[in-house]
Amino acid sequence: MMRSHYCGQLNESLEGQEVTLCGWVHRRRDHGGVIFLDIRDREGLAQVVFDPDRAETFAKADRVRSEYVVRITGKVRPRPAGAVNPNMASGAIEVLGYELDVLNQAETPPFPLDEYSDVGEETRLRYRFIDLRRPEMAAKLKLRSSITSSIRRYLDENGFLDVETPILTRATPEGARDYLVPSRTHAGSFFALPQSPQLFKQLLMVAGFDRYYQIAKCFRDEDLRADRQPEFTQIDIETSFLDEADIMGITENMIRKLFKEVLDVEFGELPHMTFEEAMRRYGSDKPDLRIPLELVDVADQLKAVEFKVFSGPANDPKGRVAALRVPGAASMPRSQIDDYTRFVGIYGAKGLAYIKVNERAKGVEGLQSPIVKFIPKENLDVILDRVGAVDGDIVFFGADKAKIVSEALGALRIRLGHDLKLLTCEWAPLWVVDFPMFEENDDGSLSALHHPFTAPKCTPEELAANPAVALSRAYDMVLNGTELGGGSIRIHRKEMQQAVFRILGIDEAEQQEKFGFLLDALKYGAPPHGGLAFGLDRLVMLMTGASSIREVIAFPKTQSAACVMTQAPGAVDAKALRELHIRLREQPKAE
């Protein structure tokens, strides 16, 4: 081998030993006739010293520059007193170099590797192979590897089988757009890249592989946000003959073991919260429990007020009026309130009412707000008591359709928690359970809240009679306001699956066309089964403290779903298109 040690492995126990290092020149310094090279590899940095006594080697060291690839042999020795660097794993020692081979030269990188505050993300992605040399970027990918190793080890030890499922499959309605792949041998037909291995893992349960897992690539052609990529990685798990409590117990223990092994963080038993409670108290089905702010319903106190902004939603069965108390924030300037008003507008809110509680003992005179004149004093007192308002607080109000109020105040709660530094702890995991089976679309039709293969907590007859109130056997693990993973008990009887399809407007012909293979499988002794999938990229993002999943993926796409490094997607030649039976239409020019 070309090296004896990684740079980050060097320490005082190797004092006096000869070592050979391979890596990149991170930094070069010339101090009074002595040359120092900081050599970098994936494990860290090591300081190598060259003195003029070895003239040939010293001359080579004098010629090297940043990012040259080098091989160095030398002897480990303690650093002089006062020269120890506590910020480096190898900071107590240095290597006295006596052999230096330049394995390759390097041009000056397009950006410095020691700081990148002024480097645009597109430049970093264009030269990702250089960006990944940064110690902090390498650390994220190393942690990702540790995470997948821990998960594989746990699942292997618990009897799970790692089984691969197809990448080329057929399009099924799973919520997002599919990436389509034209078939050369079947003219006019297309494969789809899988949005998840959902149906294949269910078929593996029918086949008798009762504990399956896969670290799977998934693909969704959707609009991108900070936590989305067109291709992403899923920790996919499915089991037979286990109920919700069993599956949640196995996967919860996996996550607790993972955090202990990788970050030395211990979680207690995860609390459970229903979907209804999460939406009511936090305005989100993935609540961030680190933030000690809650939404409080006050519609009952505002039904009779003349202020239609409040009384309208308060009397609407589909409306909601909720309050959000922020302790000690009554001094918030109007400009900040206006900023928050614009913020909730993103979620459909038409405004943001507020009351500043300056001195409650003075009654209405001690309140600062444009809305108190519309609310009778007795109702106002009930509202302020209910939210726990005291002097120095500000109370925000949302009034609209329930969905808009929950989403707007829920998002405001998160924003306030971070802006005002209200977080009470570093980690707050929980399970959210008892999700609705369906959600109502704007046209009144129903769509599956999770996916159409989730089992309901009722019979097919009860489901058909009142689908809008049916609850599902679904469960999500949430951490710090982010959905880590979601799963459910699946439908394993054909009649129930067809009942769900009918509610979703999928008739018999479409059922057979798109899901005939699944319905066939359910006829041949499908066992009770269920599972869960974790988003690996999100998990790594949280565990590394990264701001985006692009920071924890080796070669991510941009927010426009492109790779600026390889220039993908790109054009293909006419011959390849003909073989695929595809003809491109010229796009009309914009006037």
Swiss-Prot record:
EC number: 6.1.1.23
Residue positions binding ATP: R220, D221, E222, Q229, E483, G535, L536, D537, R538
Subcellular location: Cytoplasm
Residues noted as binding L-aspartate in the record, renumbered to the chain: E174, R220, H450, R490
Site (Important for tRNA non-discrimination): H31, G82
Annotated SUPFAM superfamilies: Class II aaRS and biotin synthetases, GAD domain-like, Nucleic acid-binding proteins
Disulfide bond sites: none
Catalytic activity: tRNA(Asx) + L-aspartate + ATP = L-aspartyl-tRNA(Asx) + AMP + diphosphate
InterPro entries (UniProt xref): Aa-tRNA-synt_II, aa-tRNA-synth_II, aa-tRNA-synth_II/BPL/LPL, Asp-tRNA-ligase_1, Asp-tRNA-ligase_1_N, Asp/Asn-tRNA-synth_IIb, AspRS_core, GAD-like_sf
Pfam families named among the record's database cross-references: GAD (PF02938), tRNA-synt_2 (PF00152), tRNA_anti-codon (PF01336)
One GO CC term, this protein: cytoplasm
Any Gene Ontology biological process: aspartyl-tRNA aminoacylation
Region (Aspartate): 198-201
GO molecular function, one term: nucleic acid binding
Superkingdom per UniProt: Bacteria
Annotated function: Aspartyl-tRNA synthetase with relaxed tRNA specificity since it is able to aspartylate not only its cognate tRNA(Asp) but also tRNA(Asn). Reaction proceeds in two steps: L-aspartate is first activated by ATP to form Asp-AMP and then transferred to the acceptor end of tRNA(Asp/Asn).
Record family assignment: Belongs to the class-II aminoacyl-tRNA synthetase family. Type 1 subfamily.
Summary of subunit composition and partner proteins: Homodimer.
Protein name (database record): Aspartate--tRNA(Asp/Asn) ligase
Organism: Azotobacter vinelandii (strain DJ / ATCC BAA-1303)
Organism lineage: Bacteria, Pseudomonadati, Pseudomonadota, Gammaproteobacteria, Pseudomonadales
